[in-house]
Amino acid sequence: MYLFVNIIWRNFISKNNLPKANREIRAREVRLVDENSEMHGVVNIREALDMAERAGLDLVEISPNAVPPVCKILDFGKFKYENKKRLHEARKKQKIVVLKEMKFKPNISIGDFETKLRKIKEFLKDGDKVKISLWFKGREILHKEVGHELFKRIELALEGLIKIDQHAKMEGKQMIMIISPDIKV
């Protein structure tokens, strides 16, 4: 029973994002475009199906919202393949931007600062955004100017490589700044 329902559900989902073809088209009249992209005007659905059958191709509803719907005579298998290929190419070209975080403390040593700075540069080269957070503990929060100085040092060290998306601001017991790679570089 479960397998049967699963097969029906899978077919229901996969058919929803495809255009209607051949006998699935419910309109009485359609605006027909043949395989050579020539307009035949408004035609009865039976005539359109006969023309598609004679050509050995399928009648595919291209624009279902038009009145009457626009249908084209073409190879539906090839149409699905090209559509799938186009979606795959678009997905491949998509760039996912990741937000990386680098945590600092107000009294960071020079060596640790340079190491973290080197890691931030790697993140920026990969095209990722970086959230720089400065954690204050106890009474360190009374000296926010130390945090601002640290962020200025970071900005100067990365000058020309970054674009500041969000300037330094306090959120609870931490100061945050978000940077991204400068596109010009």
From Swiss-Prot:
Cellular compartments annotated: Cytoplasm
Cleavable signal peptide: none
Keyword Cytoplasm in record: yes
Main location: cytoplasm
GO function term, MF aspect, one: translation initiation factor activity
Keyword annotations: Cytoplasm, Initiation factor, Protein biosynthesis
GO biological process: ribosome disassembly
GO CC annotation terms, alphabetical: cytosol; membrane
Matches recorded under InterPro entries: T_IF-3_C_sf, T_IF-3_N_sf, Translation_initiation_fac3_CS, Translation_initiation_fac_3, Translation_initiation_fac_3_C, Translation_initiation_fac_3_N
HAMAP family hit by this protein: IF_3
Role noted for this protein: IF-3 binds to the 30S ribosomal subunit and shifts the equilibrium between 70S ribosomes and their 50S and 30S subunits in favor of the free subunits, thus enhancing the availability of 30S subunits on which protein synthesis initiation begins.
Assembly with partners or alone: Monomer.
Family affiliation: Belongs to the IF-3 family.
Protein name: Translation initiation factor IF-3
Native organism: Rickettsia typhi (strain ATCC VR-144 / Wilmington)
